[in-house]
């Protein structure tokens, strides 16, 4: 076997492989003998059919099958010999293939990039310094009360915190437009659900009042035909309701299954908030470390890996919406391409951190991660036992632990400082 390697643009490589004719003919002859021996032919006893007849009937099909098998096998031998690491399946192209002649074919594919980590000392990370304060717990209890609240008719004007039930008809240039009409539409004031100016027109109005407002749809509005358009809405206020909050007492506490009355609920709420806060702090640190790693290391990415990741994201999107990945229409690639590329880049860079630091999943960290995750469930011991009895789940947690260890390795070389945050400030931040 002869092999030549051609480096194309970026990560693309082309192998030209020559396989001696004798190898091909031997493989074809062996397969034809196997057919003659095991297949029945009319007019002949099993195994007694003339080889010329078998070759005439099956020769071309066998030769094609042999060619595919030979190309695959010799490609693997070639990449082992040349110490090449393909990032995806190759595309085979026969160049010369005729009976009695050497087989010459090309294999085109991409390789993994060679990653030489740099700039870890330039990665900047601000470590959040934050705690759950009494006022944070009080605010969370108020949120729980609002979730359990009821609405009651009131002879009041609509304002933030009230709920106005309205009828409305929207028009543009005097013509009603699709989706611009509703009856008995409940609108909780102050939530910003409507386009700018809509709620402002309703504020101060009572049940039975009618009004007309002029507004503009934002340029970034989701409906293409309404972006930036000036519109007019005729509105009737059907009723205005005030929110009635339940008292913070034992009856309220019982709805959440907490023990120890109001103080017990406060303690449970604080515990949950502290657990969520710890995870948010960890995520914030990890996000900054990985962002810095990506910014400092610009690498080529094999398109084959991006293709694979796009497909994974497509399937996850379909499953999130309760669909079947086999029957759902294929979602556009552009919805996922940027995220897919980012995930591939992060995976390659973290893989290099793990390799260069010679990291292995720490058993104690794996246990700690499982216990931390299990603490959010009613019976943590049952969850821990489930993980420990499921090798696939354990492997998933080992990968999580290994990723955390890689982040720790980045932080050890990064510029890390501390920054004070409030609870809500940190919890409401969106990932960069």
Swiss-Prot record:
**What InterPro entries does this protein map onto?**
PPIase_dom_sf, PPIase_FKBP_dom, Trig_fac, Trigger_fac_C, Trigger_fac_C_sf, Trigger_fac_ribosome-bd_bac, Trigger_fac_ribosome-bd_sf, Trigger_fact/SurA_dom_sf
List the transmembrane segments. none
Q: What is catalyzed by this enzyme? A: [protein]-peptidylproline (omega=180) = [protein]-peptidylproline (omega=0)
* GO MF annotations, alphabetized: peptidyl-prolyl cis-trans isomerase activity; protein folding chaperone; ribosome binding
Which GO BP terms, alphabetically?
Answer: 'de novo' cotranslational protein folding; cell division; chaperone-mediated protein folding; protein transport; protein unfolding
- Family annotation (Gene3D superfamilies): 3.10.50.40, Trigger factor ribosome-binding domain, Trigger factor, C-terminal domain
Localization of this protein: Cytoplasm
Q: Which UniProt keywords apply?
A: Cell cycle, Cell division, Chaperone, Cytoplasm, Isomerase, Rotamase
Q: What is its EC number?
A: 5.2.1.8
Recorded family membership: Belongs to the FKBP-type PPIase family. Tig subfamily.
The record comments on the domains as follows: Consists of 3 domains; the N-terminus binds the ribosome, the middle domain has PPIase activity, while the C-terminus has intrinsic chaperone activity on its own.
Report the function annotation for this chain. Answer: Involved in protein export. Acts as a chaperone by maintaining the newly synthesized protein in an open conformation. Functions as a peptidyl-prolyl cis-trans isomerase.
**Record-given protein name:** Trigger factor
Lineage, uppermost ranks: Bacteria, Pseudomonadati, Pseudomonadota, Gammaproteobacteria, Vibrionales
């Amino acid at each position: 076997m002869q092999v030549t390697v051609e480096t194309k643009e970026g990560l693309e490589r082309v192998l030209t492989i020559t396989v001696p004719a004798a190898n091909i003919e031997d493989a074809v002859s062996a397969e034809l003998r196997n057919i003659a021996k095991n297949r029945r032919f009319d007019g002949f006893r099993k195994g007694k059919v003339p080889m010329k007849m078998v070759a005439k009937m099956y020769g071309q099909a066998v030769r094609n099958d042999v060619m595919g098998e030979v190309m695959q096998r010799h490609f693997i031998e070639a990449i082992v010999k040349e110490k090449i690491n393909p990032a995806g399946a190759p595309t085979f192209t026969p160049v010369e293939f005729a009976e009695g002649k050497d087989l010459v074919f090309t294999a085109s594919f991409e390789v993994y990039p060679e990653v030489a980590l740099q700039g870890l000392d330039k990665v900047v990370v601000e470590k959040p310094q934050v705690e759950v304060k009494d006022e944070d717990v009080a605010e969370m209890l108020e949120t729980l009360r609002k979730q359990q609240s009821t609405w009651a008719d009131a002879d009041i004007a609509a304002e933030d915190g009230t709920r106005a039930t309205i009828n409305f008809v929207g028009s543009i240039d005097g013509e009603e437009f699709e989706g611009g009409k509703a009856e008995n539409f409940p609108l909780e004031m102050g939530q910003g659900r409507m386009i700018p100016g809509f709620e402002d027109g309703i504020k101060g109005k009572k049940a039975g009042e009618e009004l007309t407002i002029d507004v503009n749809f934002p340029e970034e509005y989701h409906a293409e035909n309404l972006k930036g358009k000036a519109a007019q809405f005729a509105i009737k206020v059907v009723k205005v309701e005030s929110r009635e909050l339940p008292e913070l007492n034992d009856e309220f506490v019982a709805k959440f299954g907490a023990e120890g009355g109001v103080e017990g609920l406060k303690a449970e709420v604080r515990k949950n908030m502290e657990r969520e806060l710890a995870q948010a702090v960890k995520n914030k640190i990890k996000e900054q470390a990985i962002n810095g790693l990506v910014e400092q290391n610009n690498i080529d990415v094999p398109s084959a890996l991006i293709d694979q990741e796009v497909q994974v994201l497509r399937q996850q999107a379909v499953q999130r919406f309760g669909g079947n990945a086999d029957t759902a229409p294929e979602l556009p690639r552009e919805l996922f391409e940027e995220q897919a590329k980012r995930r591939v880049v992060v995976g390659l860079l973290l893989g290099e951190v793990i390799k260069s630091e010679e990291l292995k999943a720490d058993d104690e960290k794996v246990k700690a991660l499982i216990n931390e995750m299990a603490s959010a469930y009613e019976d943590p011991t049952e969850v821990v036992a489930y993980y420990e009895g499921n090798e696939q789940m354990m492997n998933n947690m080992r990968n999580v632990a290994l990723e955390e260890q890689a982040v720790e390795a980045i932080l050890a070389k990064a510029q890390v400082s501390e920054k004070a945050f409030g609870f809500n400030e940190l919890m409401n931040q969106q990932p960069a």
